[in-house]
């Protein structure tokens, strides 16, 4: 975690890393300058919800698309 503090993320990005750390999530999956803070947010929420974030772990997918995928994964899990 301390190494990520030195990696010059903007405040909004680092906030998502910090929240993942506090929640006990594997924030290393999204702690990359390649992701916007909004994308990091959707990945963090997916990890928290225990959905397969690898499906949308791609910085070319917009945060809004990530949200749609995450919600669909949540919905399909509840149907099973």
Q: How should these model regions be labeled?
A:
Residues 1-80:
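General marker for long, soluble alpha-helical cores
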């Amino acid at each position: 975690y301390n190494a990520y503090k030195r990696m010059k993320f903007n405040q909004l990005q680092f906030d998502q890393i910090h929240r993942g750390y506090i929640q006990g999530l594997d924030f290393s999956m999204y702690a990359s300058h390649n992701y916007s803070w909004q994308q990091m947010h959707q990945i963090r929420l997916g990890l928290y919800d225990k959905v397969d974030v690898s499906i949308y772990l791609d910085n070319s997918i917009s945060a809004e698309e990530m949200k749609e995928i995450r919600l669909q994964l949540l919905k399909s899990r509840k149907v099973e």
